[in-house]
Amino acid sequence: MTESKAPYGNESAIQAEIVKRLRAAGWYVIVTSQDRRTRKQLADIPDLICFRCGMTLLVECKTPMGQMRQGQVDFQCDMLPHLGRSLAYRVMRYPEDAEEWYD
């Protein structure tokens, strides 16, 4: 962890802060990891699906030491051929990681 990045605790706290920051920057954010039933149905889908100005951002929230499950890695690999200027997939470990998407 770098000195400039504050500790936010668990994955839920990191995710909540990322959602807050992206929404403040004008993104429409759908949280897919809300409850146990939803998590089971959408097991490998990224935690956040975000839309703004024709751009779609898929975000997997992890703690600095958090590891992606194999299904999440597979989903990311399956998405790679479809990524372009209007679709991006990111793993964010700190709320500050969302800053590149503010403009």
Language-model region placement:
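Catalytic phosphate/metal-binding cores of nucleic-acid and nucleotide-processing enzymes, i.e., regions
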Residues: 1-103
